[in-house]
Amino acid sequence: MSKNFLNKAWEKWNPGEIDTTTNITHNNFKKSDQVSNFSNTFTAEQNNDNLNNIKKNGYEDGFKRGKKEGFEAGFKKSFAEFEKKNREILNKMEDFLSNFRQSLSLFDEKVSSKIINTVLKISKKVLETTTLANDDSSFLKKIETIFQDRMFSLENPKLFISPNNQLLVKKYFGKIFSQYGWTICYNHYIPSGEFIISSGDTILDSTSSTRWNKLCKLVYFQEKQ
């Protein structure tokens, strides 16, 4: 090494004079890139999570709605079947009650006619036997006495029905028939929904075949006249 180099005056070196702009900018650029990439990645993941939540919530809402609609549809179907089944029973009951009410009215007419005929016979007997035929009070007392001795009511009333109506009649009308002393009987020859009432020596046949025969006889009798 030469003496000139050693003898050369040393220049003062200051570390602050180093130009670090390029490195700092480069480093800052890298850090900014990393932050941006992280931010983009976080946003994408957040969007995916939101999308998954939307799908999940949509699926749950759809499942609940479908379950509710399915339940309502099933309930409506079951209720319609129940209503249809019970409507058939109600229709049978209404038909039975209508026929029974009509038959009882006819039966009452027969009983009333029988009572009137009995009253006429009693009146005739009283008029023939009493010495006081013109005494109204005596006449009424004798009729009252005779009426007290004889009970004008249904004697052992019986209702004959088809075996097909056995369960229906027993279930809905068994108690009331039993309460009023009616006996329910079954006959295979009686069509379903029709019946025969008997009491003492009075019989009321409300079957369609009997009504048809009576109608034919009535028409035949009118044609003969």
From Swiss-Prot:
Report a single Gene Ontology molecular function: cytoskeletal motor activity
Coiled coil location = none
Does the record carry Signal as a key word?
Answer: no
GO BP: any one term: bacterial-type flagellum organization
* Keyword terms: Bacterial flagellum biogenesis, Bacterial flagellum protein export, Cytoplasm, Protein transport, Transport
Give the UniProt subcellular location, in the record's own words.
Cytoplasm
Keyword Repeat assigned: no
The disulfides recorded in the entry are none
- GO CC, one annotated term: cytosol
Q: Which Pfam families match?
A: FliH
Q: Which family does it belong to?
A: Belongs to the FliH family.
The free-text function statement in the UniProt record for this protein reads: Needed for flagellar regrowth and assembly.
Q: Which PANTHER family match?
A: FLAGELLAR ASSEMBLY PROTEIN FLIH (PTHR34982:SF1), YOP PROTEINS TRANSLOCATION PROTEIN L (PTHR34982)
Q: State what protein this is by name.
A: Flagellar assembly protein FliH
Q: Which organism is it from?
A: Buchnera aphidicola subsp. Baizongia pistaciae (strain Bp)
Recite the lineage of the species. Answer: Bacteria, Pseudomonadati, Pseudomonadota, Gammaproteobacteria, Enterobacterales
